[in-house]
Regions:
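C-terminal terminal-subdomain/extension
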Residues: 2-4, 79-135
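Short alpha-helix capping/helix-loop boundary micro-motifs
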Residues: 5-10
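Short, charged beta-turn/beta-strand-edge "cap" motif at the junction between a beta-strand
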Residues: 27-31
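Compact nucleic-acid interaction/catalytic patches
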Residues: 34-78
Length: 135
């Protein structure tokens, strides 16, 4: 089956919400170096619902069930589809809605809070907020 046939045959995804976990696909040859190279993988939507409602692109963080023994600085634990895993927060990317294959679940509020904290660190937002005297 070609990717185009597979792409056309997938169920229609209607409304996408922050915190939802989707199976999505990427072209294997798009990745270089240490970027994720798998054709299909899981990811959690982290773009805001206001953006998700109107846009056809979503900000997503890939999830993995590999190497769970150690959680690195920009990773956090997850539990999706009855499987333990982790969010690879430093691998954040934007994907088109057409890449989404199926919804598998939703992260808990606690899991999303952990992701938000790591995002603040990755983008140095704590320093920005301190400079603006917002924290």
């Amino acid at each position: 089956m070609t990717l185009i046939k597979k792409f056309k045959a997938k169920p229609k995804i209607s409304e996408v919400k922050k915190g939802e976990v989707y199976r999505y696909w990427i072209w294997k040859h798009e990745a270089v170096g240490t970027e994720i190279k798998k054709k299909e993988r899981l990811g959690v939507i982290i773009s805001t619902n206001g953006l998700n409602k109107w846009d056809k692109r979503f900000v997503i963080i890939p999830l993995t069930s590999k190497k769970l023994g150690e959680i690195y600085r920009y990773e956090t634990r997850t539990f999706v589809d009855s499987k333990h895993g982790k969010a690879l927060i430093d691998q954040i990317k934007t994907v088109d809605k057409k890449r989404l294959i199926e919804k598998l679940g939703q992260l808990t509020e606690k899991e999303m809070d952990a992701i938000h904290e790591k995002l603040f660190s990755i983008f140095d937002l704590w320093e920005y907020l301190k400079k603006r005297e917002l924290v």
